[in-house]
Amino acid sequence: MTPEHLPTEQYEAQLAEKVVRLQSMMAPFSDLVPEVFRSPVSHYRMRAEFRIWHDGDDLYHIIFDQQTKSRIRVDSFPAASELINQLMTAMIAGVRNNPVLRHKLFQIDYLTTLSNQAVVSLLYHKKLDDEWRQEAEALRDALRAQNLNVHLIGRATKTKIALDQDYIDERLPVAGKEMIYRQVENSFTQPNAAMNIQMLEWALDVTKGSKGDLLELYCGNGNFSLALARNFDRVLATEIAKPSVAAAQYNIAANHIDNVQIIRMAAEEFTQAMNGVREFNRLQGIDLKSYQFETIFVDPPRSGLDSETEKMVQAYPRILYISCNPETLCKNLETLSQTHKVERLALFDQFPYTHHMECGVLLTAK
């Protein structure tokens, strides 16, 4: 695979290999055949970051080869959304012959949505001033004249200039209902929107008919908690990153959801609060004892659940676990399978043409 060529003819074989690999990894815990969710074979990534290489009068996007660390020029990127590809061409054309925008520019980040909105961040090794803002506004207006719905941001050390706004609003069709998700620049969002829809619909399917309340750790911008709210009486979700919490609060209002509460704290802190080890001011006004948590949802970082959180989640009748690293999922299952059994298993091909797998398991108490 090269950045400008995807081996689409190999997609089926690569996906089949992942299914076999996941089944083998899960064999100690389950004999289930994974439910498999395919990715689009191209234009599936909604965000991308490129270094910018200055070559005489020329200027272009590059990435570095992971093995050799050599530079690879990238003029098109079929893994990324069609909007990112349009913007890559338009940004280079707009910046190449503009000394103010070009000088000391070292990276461009792209974030797009299925609703065809974009935020483009230009990263600099220099101070950004009013002259930069004027030139950037002219570029933004020129891009919009090409029917590109784009917002520009300039970044430098301790500086962030958002010309209009630093977010875009995604609209996803999820099980017959449109969900609105605010996505903030430089915050985590799901990279593969088509796969995200399938993950949300699978999570809805495995929790349909649920009783009681849902607890979610690591909720980000509320991606899962808001979609799942329709299956539960109430949802309580935790997140540590301030921009994500603010986006989640916006998303609750935008989707007219009245049974979700987001609190800003780490999963480890919430574990302490639930166990009565510590009291937190951030939990004032929230009566944890009034919740009837029957299901806990976790979507941890690649490192998986720490041992304290492992113990905590074992207290719940049902555990819904989305994993971006099946190796740490299996490590967690060594503990979780002592008290719970695997009821559902899914493979989400979030990252086609790579070794990486995303998977989901529903665990129920034995």
Swiss-Prot record:
Pfam families: tRNA_U5-meth_tr (PF05958). This is tRNA/tmRNA (uracil-C(5))-methyltransferase. It catalyses: uridine(54) in tRNA + S-adenosyl-L-methionine = 5-methyluridine(54) in tRNA + S-adenosyl-L-homocysteine + H(+); uridine(341) in tmRNA + S-adenosyl-L-methionine = 5-methyluridine(341) in tmRNA + S-adenosyl-L-homocysteine + H(+). It is an enzyme of class 2 (transferase). GO terms for cellular component: cytosol. It comes from the Bacteria. PANTHER family: TRNA/TMRNA (URACIL-C(5))-METHYLTRANSFERASE, TRNA_TMRNA (URACIL-C(5))-METHYLTRANSFERASE. Its EC number is 2.1.1.-, 2.1.1.35. S-adenosyl-L-methionine binds at Q190, Y218, N223, E239, D299. It comes from Shigella flexneri. Belongs to the class I-like SAM-binding methyltransferase superfamily. RNA M5U methyltransferase family. TrmA subfamily. InterPro entries: MeTrfase_TrmA_AS (IPR030390), MeTrfase_TrmA_CS (IPR030391), SAM-dependent_MTases_sf (IPR029063), TrmA_MeTrfase (IPR011869), U5_MeTrfase_fam (IPR010280). GO terms for molecular function: rRNA binding; tRNA (uracil(54)-C5)-methyltransferase activity, S-adenosyl methionine-dependent; tRNA binding. GO terms for biological process: tRNA methylation. Keywords: Methyltransferase, S-adenosyl-L-methionine, Transferase, tRNA processing. The keyword Transferase applies. Dual-specificity methyltransferase that catalyzes the formation of 5-methyluridine at position 54 (m5U54) in all tRNAs, and that of position 341 (m5U341) in tmRNA (transfer-mRNA).
